[in-house]
């Protein structure tokens, strides 16, 4: 079984956006034992897309066409797919009524072109879009399948999980059984982690172990093929037990979509504690990470973005003498930021971020110099200094600072 992923979009071809959809779909297909054999990217030009689809159908049995399902002139995917298949477009009347009702409820003027989001090639099967307007499509032709999916990542992932994966599992029900589990680790170099995991699982046959590096974390996927689910889960349990006997201090949970922010929120919930933050170089990114977790309101009431020294003094009560003596980028300032926000909101945990995001130096310190302060109920205030590589850029320095802050809280809450 050969599968091909076709990504449609001039922005992707020109490198203006990163193609996360193709990576996501390829990963899910691998988990379903339907690995992609080819990936192609093409711009928003109908004739070129038609040639790409025709070529894909000569070498693949399963073809995915991703992106270009909007109502604008450059959204050419569904009409082009229909033309390539020699079919007319048909309208899903129920979905079209739902689109009209949605625009009416939101009090937004609807253009006639929006009907394109309710259309698909005649003879195909519409795929529901749980979080957007445009339908996808599943079309079977001469022993092959063409699948059309939307471009916006949130819509893409929702349609893949809710509409496409169940359809693939039903259609390819004779495929081999595949069972997998993802373990998440932090604070460990990938090469060292994988060497130790290999040593711990040498005597467990029939299990595949692969790693995927994320910012400041590593995902390790355990996979078993060709066994009934119960037997496969038992083998994975055995492997996980052997791995955690060696790597437990660096393990923070199970799941493909698990984030450290979610784990921290759950830890705080269990204690009945609340968290706040005072951010300088991260500019609210830490608080955004916390608020992205459903249910975060039970542990987070609010926080501070104190970019300027004057804001640190006014909002957090940091003595001017502290900043004047030690500087903004210092252990002392990070500590007083953490203590100040904790005190102001009367919560159990306060964290402070100060540093140099770059590209320029600040107070004689290079980009990538970061101090994080942590004030926690019943414990002495702790500070940690980071020396992040300046070449990764301003945004990466800010993102990594947030992740290291989450790590600091996580480890302290585990004690």
From Swiss-Prot:
Pfam families assigned to the protein according to its UniProt record, in alphabetical order: CinA (PF02464), CinA_KH (PF18146), MoCF_biosynth (PF00994)
NCBIfam families in the record: cinA_nterm, PncC_domain, PRK00549.1
Family note: Belongs to the CinA family.
Xref: PANTHER family: NICOTINAMIDE-NUCLEOTIDE AMIDOHYDROLASE PNCC, NMN AMIDOHYDROLASE-LIKE PROTEIN YFAY
Name listed for the protein in its UniProt record: Putative competence-damage inducible protein
